[in-house]
């Protein structure tokens, strides 16, 4: 199955999921709930700017809470959003990524709410296959600081529209690109430019993808390398040679008995 086929399947499924959600909480009601939430915390998003957190961090680790993946199945089915994200924060994460896709990643919006409830105060990335505005309302309501937009899932116009709305809601955008075809989206000027090292067609990861594509990114932007990072030396290379400031890592920590301690040990070797 090719990358386009997998994404087509996921996006088609996501449209059905969103329509079901809308029947449960109608769009107008979701807007009202989100507006009420935006009045809290002085109108600011919880966690503050993810971009600033990465740029000002010595490590730039975005620790991911991911219980499951399409390629590996369950990684940590028993993982609790009330425990692991807070442990990540205590052990040095610059920001968090929390999967909220149900079927493919075993995640829920409520996981972000739970993390915030127990005291997570650093930026949280809402990681899902975002294809329409309703999901941005969900992200803002549950306590996300930033949202992931995947170039391969969206037309350029759709991406621009969603990015503008995310900004109106006070959230930042991490735009994920995987290959040179996606780079026409770079001119939309997202807050953070992500390069995914995982081929969604084969699920093979190749960190060299970040080095290859980094040269094509605008200079002086916040670059994030996603997937396939397991060695502290790789993070050093990405930072020094590729100019990356963020490093999204999930499976490397989640497969360990204690993800937070695994993060601390990784950071100690940077």
Q: What does each model-identified segment do?
A:
Residues 2-76:
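An N-cap/entry alpha-helix motif that binds or orients negatively charged groups
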Residues 207-215, 221-226, 230-233, 250:
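Catalytic alpha/beta core domains of metabolic enzymes, predominantly
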Residues 212-216, 255-270:
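C-terminal helical cap(s) of enzyme catalytic domains, especially alpha/beta-barrels
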Residues 60, 65, 72-174, 181-185, ...:
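N-terminal active-site wall of soluble small-molecule enzyme domains
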Residues 131-143, 178-189, 225-249, 261:
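Catalytic cores of alpha/beta
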Residues 8, 94, 145, 191, ...:
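Receiver (REC) domain switch/active-site residues of two-component response regulators
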Residues 98, 138-158, 195-204, 243-263:
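Glycine-rich phosphate-binding active-site loops on the catalytic face of alpha/beta enzymes
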Residues 13, 66-68, 101, 129, ...:
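Active-site beta-loop-alpha junctions enriched in small/polar residues
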């Amino acid at each position: 199955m090719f990358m386009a086929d997998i994404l087509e399947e996921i996006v088609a499924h996501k449209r059905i999921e969103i329509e079901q959600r809308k029947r449960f909480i109608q769009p107008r009601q979701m807007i009202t709930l989100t507006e009420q939430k935006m009045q809290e915390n002085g109108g600011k998003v919880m966690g503050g700017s993810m971009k600033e957190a990465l740029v000002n961090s010595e490590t730039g680790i975005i620790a991911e809470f991911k219980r499951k993946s399409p390629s590996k199945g369950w990684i940590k089915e028993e993982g609790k959003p009330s425990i692991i994200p807070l442990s990540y924060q205590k052990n040095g994460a610059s920001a968090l990524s929390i999967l909220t896709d149900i079927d493919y990643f075993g995640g829920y919006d409520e996981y972000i709410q739970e993390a915030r409830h127990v005291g997570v105060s650093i930026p949280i990335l809402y990681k899902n296959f975002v294809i329409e505005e309703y999901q941005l309302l969900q992200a803002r309501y549950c306590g996300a600081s930033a949202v992931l937009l995947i170039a391969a899932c969206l037309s350029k116009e759709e991406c621009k529209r969603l990015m503008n709305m995310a900004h109106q809601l006070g959230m930042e955008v991490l735009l994920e690109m995987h290959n040179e075809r996606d780079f026409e989206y770079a001119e939309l000027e997202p807050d953070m430019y992500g390069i995914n090292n995982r081929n969604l067609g084969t699920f093979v990861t190749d960190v060299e993808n970040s080095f290859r594509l980094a040269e094509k990114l605008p200079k002086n932007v916040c670059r994030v390398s996603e997937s396939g990072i397991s060695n502290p030396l790789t993070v050093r290379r990405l930072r020094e040679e590729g100019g990356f400031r963020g490093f999204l890592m999930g499976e490397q920590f989640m497969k360990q008995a204690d993800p937070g301690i695994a993060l601390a040990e990784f950071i100690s070797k940077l």
